């Protein structure tokens, strides 16, 4: 074990202790976004930027009723997509990012939402927080803190 690893060991131990305490305090902590698939979680999380989960959950039934998967979102009419997500704010950027992310998922990831941080971060509209939410709630991978 190198000197850097020895220095990090107490921090790693402390992090695990904090995580254990949080799990005891919040044993039933879940994602409040409504979704059925990893792509729906990704889309809902993109929509949740600068918006409440409650508002997103009002928008997603119609959105996912019309466009339930990456394939349909990738080819959706952008104006129609914008109108469906308008009430979440920043709707033009969100619609563009959702469509771009879904196109990449279809073309580069065989229509499967990636389960690795590096790949998720390549998707338009996806930063670490969104990637952490998807990894944690769609795949059970705790790669960071999600709030």
Regions found by a protein language model. Give the residues of each.
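Catalytic cores of DNA base-excision repair glycosylases
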Residues: 3-147
